[in-house]
């Protein structure tokens, strides 16, 4: 396609359909076409090259209008295709003229190369591209992880995950990014620009995609469905993360210990265990946290804020996840099943913790004493032993605790509350853990098995005590005579000899 040197118009790279052709497209094709047109146009306005465009002062206004009539026509078409009915501001409409660009830009229809010497553009057929998506064909394979992609540009972006390349750097703060779109989105943090506003609640967003995803909160729309279990999601990334549960894929590996994770955020959080880094500090009490969500949950303790209420019983919670977990108590739903023993759980985290019984995995290690734990919460609880901190005090008796959950459990002693009832015998309990242990009496379940002799136990604590027979470990020592015992109860009984009771 030959054009004037250094000048490319939006019409040169946009794919257009006649009215007759448009009628033959189904809704999915029209939606894809709309998204493609938006991306193409967004790439053009993001080039920010209008300052290099020089209008010929000898040209009449009429001549200029004739030259750019096609661009305006296509822009109007995009506006009509937009879900909002009008997506372009006046400023954006003025940015459809482009000049020179040093680096190539890749999009849905091919690769656009703009240089000062020549302009080339290779178009791919829109409908053949759509057909490839429909058929699930993936032509470009990553040699590192064998993942395949429909477009070469997507493969190029993916390869930067393996190489660590981040060629797009923010001029304000120097933060690098793998994709130019990520840099553009990040730059709006510095400018404070949030041009996309939700008409339902007034919340504003930096990018259109965030607004589209947010609006699904109001509409309840969940267009992305898992083919394995039928669970639906608002955002495609949520579906992609969820599918790793079924595939077992854990692409994010810790270079320190080799542990792998399904999500990049989980790897980032895990790596702070090695560095002991706690970036997020509470301004109220100075307590620091490994990750932002932990800080936000903690801050609600100071404010007393519990915005999430259960419609069934009225109980309120600080975070939405707690409400979701609580609601499964009313529904009785237990969608997570252990493949080893068939036991089902309300929460995926409960299943993961349970599976460590079978694998004997204890992935969380204390950097102070090197003791290992099967869950992160156990590690956090243990670490407060070393610092001696007990920030949670009971207003009734003044007893202090390391964890808020310990204080909550303790307070039920004063109130006499026993909210957890066994459905078999109606016996009530103060703690859920007590109810869980009690249930095994009715079921006869003994999930904790000794590897040395095969004997099974109802509780993990029983297994731990039993294993000391094989190891010879006697951790409880008498201060009077230095005699050691396997169990604390044996030590207590022995000490009565010295006291004369």
UniProtKB/Swiss-Prot annotation:
A zinc finger (C2H2-type) spans 140-162, 168-190, 196-218, 224-246, 252-274, 280-302, 308-330, 336-358, 364-386, 392-414, 420-442, 448-470, 476-498. Keywords: DNA-binding, Metal-binding, Nucleus, Repeat, Zinc, Zinc-finger. CDD domains: KRAB_A-box. GO terms for cellular component: nucleus. GO terms for molecular function: DNA binding; zinc ion binding. InterPro entries: KRAB, KRAB_dom_sf, Znf_C2H2-type, Znf_C2H2_sf, Znf_C2H2_type. May be involved in transcriptional regulation. Belongs to the krueppel C2H2-type zinc-finger protein family. This is Zinc finger protein 14. The lineage of its organism: Eukaryota, Metazoa, Chordata, Craniata, Vertebrata. The gene is Zfp14.
């Amino acid at each position: 396609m030959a054009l004037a040197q250094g000048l490319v118009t939006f019409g040169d790279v946009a794919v257009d359909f006649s009215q007759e052709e448009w009628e033959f497209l189904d809704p999915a094709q029209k939606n894809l076409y709309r998204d493609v047109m938006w991306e193409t146009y967004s790439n053009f306005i993001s080039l920010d090259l209008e300052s290099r465009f020089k209008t010929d002062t000898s040209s009449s206004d009429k001549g200029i209008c004739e030259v750019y009539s096609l661009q305006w026509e296509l822009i109007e078409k995009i506006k009509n295709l937009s879900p909002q009915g009008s997506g372009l501001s006046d400023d954006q409409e003025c940015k459809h003229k482009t000049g020179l660009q040093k680096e190539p830009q890749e999009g849905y229809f091919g690769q656009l190369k703009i240089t000062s010497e020549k302009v080339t553009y290779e178009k791919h057929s829109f409908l053949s591209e759509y057909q490839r998506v429909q058929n699930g064909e993936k032509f470009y394979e990553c040699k590192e992880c064998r993942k395949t992609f429909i477009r070469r540009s997507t493969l190029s972006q993916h390869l930067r995950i393996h190489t660590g390349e981040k060629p797009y750097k923010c001029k304000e703060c120097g933060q690098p990014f793998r994709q130019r779109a990520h840099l553009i989105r990040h730059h709006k943090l510095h400018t404070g620009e949030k041009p996309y506003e939700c008409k339902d609640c007034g919340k504003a967003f930096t990018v259109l995609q965030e607004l589209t995803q947010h609006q699904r909160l109001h509409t309840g729309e969940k267009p992305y469905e898992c083919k394995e279990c039928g669970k639906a999601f608002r955002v495609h990334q949520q579906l992609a993360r969820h599918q790793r549960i079924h595939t077992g894929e854990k692409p994010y590996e810790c270079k320190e210990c080799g542990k792998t994770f399904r999500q990049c955020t989980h790897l980032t959080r895990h790596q702070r265990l090695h560095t002991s880094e706690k970036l997020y500090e509470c301004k109220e009490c100075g307590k620091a946290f490994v990750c932002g969500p932990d800080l936000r949950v903690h801050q609600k303790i100071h404010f007393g804020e519990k915005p999430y209420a259960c419609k069934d019983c009225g109980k309120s919670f600080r975070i939405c996840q707690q409400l979701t977990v609580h609601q499964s108590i009313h529904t009785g739903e237990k969608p997570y099943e252990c493949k080893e023993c068939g036991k089902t759980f309300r929460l995926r985290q409960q299943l993961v913790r349970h599976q460590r019984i079978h694998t004997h995995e204890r992935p969380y290690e204390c950097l102070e004493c090197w003791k290992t734990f099967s869950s992160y919460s156990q590690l956090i609880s243990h670490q407060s032993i070393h610092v001696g901190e007990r920030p949670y005090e009971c207003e009734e008796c003044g007893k202090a605790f390391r964890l808020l959950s310990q204080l909550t459990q303790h307070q039920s002693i004063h109130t006499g509350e026993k909210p957890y009832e066994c459905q078999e015998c109606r016996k009530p309990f103060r703690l859920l853990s007590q109810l869980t242990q009690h249930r095994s009496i009715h079921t006869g379940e003994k999930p904790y098995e000794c590897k040395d002799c095969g004997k099974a136990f109802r509780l993990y604590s029983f297994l731990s005590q039993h294993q000391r027979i094989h190891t010879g470990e006697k951790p409880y020592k008498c201060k009077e005579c230095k005699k050691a015992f396997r169990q604390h109860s044996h030590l207590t009984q022995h000490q009565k000899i010295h006291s004369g009771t």
